Amino acid sequence: MQKFEGYSEKQKSRQHYFVYPLLFQEYIYAFAHDYGLNGSEPVEIFGCNNKKFSSILVKRLIIRMYQQNFLINSVNYPNQDRLFDHRNYFYSEFYSQILSEGFGIVVEIPLSLGQLSCPEEKEIPKFQNLQSIHSIFPFLEDKFLHLHYLSHIEIPYPIHLEILVQLLEYRIQDVPSLHLLRFFLHYYSNWNSLITSMKSIFLLKKENQRLFRFLYNSYVSEYEFFLLFLRKQSSCLRLTSSGTFLERIIFSGKMEHFGVMYPGFFRKTIWFFMDPLMHYVRYQGKAILASKGTLLLKKKWKSYLVNFSQYFFYFWTQPQRIRLNQLTNSCFDFLGYLSSVPINTLLVRNQMLENSFLIDTRMKKFNTTVPATPLVGSLSKAQFCTGSGHPISKPVWTDLSDWDILDRFGRICRNLFHYYSGSSKKQTLYRLKYILRLSCARTLARKHKSTVRTFMQRLGSVFLEEFFTEEEQVFSLMFTKTIHFSFHGSQSERIWYLDIIRINDLVNPLTLN
């Protein structure tokens, strides 16, 4: 059977941008350094607890590990496993992190080269804007107002190790590297708990999030690319022009070959993709599929997705992982926002000459709110408040200087307001700001062994300025004579920023210290 052209072209395009270096050698540092997005600056890597590791550190770790010859020692001395010696926890975790970071750099090189090889310079700023997490919300607001049903999909697991390794075979042609990756995945003791966790597919161990998230996203992208290919090809089946007619003939021939291998599956489901109003969004371990079709069509989509997973990825998908809801009667958690599309009823009084009548107008509105309970729980886990939201001091930070404590609390508050700037209602944000401000005051008072009121009176306006958000800073410039003011005038204003490239730490499992 002939392969789909689009699928093979995708593989060729990925191979075109990749030079295959030997894994764990010094050449990787030079390669990643020269093509880094930061130019002459060392490439920064997010590792344990979201701390940044420069490429210079990775280079030193790779050279050190390469000189140790761990694999040779494991063959000559099988009883002395120096790479994953669980009797020495420090070295076991240290070298497993080296392996994870090293593999993460290598497999991400093709993606960085693909971004830098843009033929037109004018498209680069536009592409960088689309990298922002907030760029998806205007799209949802524009599209979801015209849709009827929403499917919440939990992406299936567990993922077989061999499938993850096979996905990298066309990116890395160095066979020893693939064997080393397979050895690392099978030997790593926490692998089962990382991937098959019942709570979330993204509750990975912090030291190895970079590699495992990349492997997971590569795996899911193969799943999504096939659906996208069928969507694009089937959309031209309705057209009758001469150019698309040839494409229909070619695609129909491929359907015949495909039906031989998977009888009764392809022909019955290809018409699902002809829906002109169908949108798919994935975030972390979940996905959303919205459509304007009927409830019967959505139920058939649910059956199709379950069968698709069994045919192509060889695992059982539980039907209850796909939930169907009417868009106007439900809300969904999306990237930390609680989103919904309610119907607002407006009564308009119309006066025509001597007669007057009321017009009942129904309008849909895309709302994005801040979930209060999860964020208060995150602050509680970070020891900023109790479970009920009562602010407490953070004893761990009492050894820092006063300005460092103020800066840390202020930065967390500003980041929260920056990330949730698109919220329709900001009452929850001001509640979180109150918790952080009072927790900061109690931490400083505990450090200096004084009361909160005495310490806040001594700092005065300096203490309040550390918790100013971007909107409040602009507002304060307009009224420079006023120090104390209440900034609640723009609670319904939504601002989407194009510089947010990752989810806030308080939305994900906490990594705050």
UniProtKB/Swiss-Prot annotation:
Keyword set includes rRNA processing: no
InterPro entries, per the entry: Domain_X, Maturase_MatK, Maturase_MatK_N
Keywords in alphabetical order: Chloroplast, mRNA processing, Plastid, RNA-binding, tRNA processing
Localization terms from the record: Plastid, Chloroplast
Presence of keyword Chloroplast: yes
One CC-aspect GO term: chloroplast
Biological process, per Gene Ontology: mRNA processing; RNA splicing; tRNA processing
Pfam family, any one: MatK_N
GO MF assignments: RNA binding
Function noted in UniProt: Usually encoded in the trnK tRNA gene intron. Probably assists in splicing its own and other chloroplast group II introns.
Recorded family membership: Belongs to the intron maturase 2 family. MatK subfamily.
Protein known as: Maturase K
Organism whose genome encodes this protein: Saccharum officinarum
